[in-house]
Regions:
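Class I S-adenosyl-L-methionine
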Residues: 1-263
Length: 263
């Protein structure tokens, strides 16, 4: 049987890690005593593989272009170390799933031990900048949800078929995402008790289209939120919003225009 050594996989690929617990977005969940292990892949088709099948309205404004990567992309539109690393990880997923899974499982176990030693809840978000069905994360005929049935997984998604996974796996939680054009699907899911994320340009209202809104900016632990509500998120400026160094207001239905009054 072939042995897969995590350190060698990373060395061969030229990366320091596959995922982690220290991104600014995930660290916010510390406030709810949750340690989250998350994986950031190269979004939509940057890597040559499309990992975001429903991203036509949001790909230009993806959080991939925020934070430290925003600085790198503003210096060089072709990307720097962060984007290159995410591309390598994405290619590994599609081109050598076995290696990817061995490394993923190793890092999940490491992060779980860290959470346990700190007395924290543990959660896993594999689609921080992607929207891949978790049944595709497979090793030895078992997907990641089956390999870790005792652990809490969660994601945001714009893919309606992914919602079907909630009927099969009790350890998976999803928040559906409004893209400006899929309200009929969002309404149906809200009425069934699912949460829906809406990105607002300015302040977070208390109500949107007749549904209560909670402020979801404070943490990423959506699986702890109640169902049937709108999770309001404030838009974060990304590298693609800047032309010749000047900010250009995004023109997309993905971002809900709002004032400081209820919608």
């Amino acid at each position: 049987m072939k042995e897969y050594i995590p350190s060698k996989i990373k060395q061969e690929l030229g990366i320091s890690y596959l995922g982690g617990c220290n991104s600014p977005k995930l660290i916010k969940s510390y406030g709810r005593n949750v340690l989250t292990y998350g994986v950031y892949l190269a979004p939509h088709n940057i890597s040559g593989y499309d990992v975001c099948p429903e991203s036509c309205n949001c790909r230009q404004y993806c959080l991939h272009g925020s934070g430290r990567n925003k600085i790198e992309l503003l210096k060089n539109r072709e990307g720097g170390p962060i984007q290159n690393s995410r591309i390598k990880k994405t290619k590994l997923f599609f081109e050598d799933r076995v290696k990817f899974m061995h490394l993923l499982i190793h890092e999940i176990n490491q992060a779980r031990r860290k959470a346990e030693s700190n007395g924290m809840k543990f959660a896993i978000r594999l689609n921080c900048t992607s929207d891949i069905c978790l049944e595709e994360f497979v090793l030895d005929s078992k997907n990641i949800l089956q390999l870790f049935p005792e652990l809490q997984f969660y994601d945001y998604t714009k893919v309606p078929s992914h919602v079907e996974l909630l009927k099969k796996y009790t350890n998976y939680d999803l928040t559906f995402s409004f893209d400006g054009e899929n309200w009929d699907t969002c309404k149906k899911l809200l009425d069934s008790g699912l949460r829906v994320a809406v990105v607002f340009e300015e302040s977070i209202p208390t109500e949107f289209r007749g549904y209560p809104v909670i402020d979801a900016n404070g943490d990423d632990a959506r699986f702890l939120d109640e169902g049937g509500v709108i999770c309001g998120l404030t838009y974060k400026k990304v590298a693609n919003d800047y032309v010749n160094g000047k900010y250009q207001r995004p023109d997309t239905t993905f971002i809900t225009r709002n004032k400081k009054t209820n919608q």
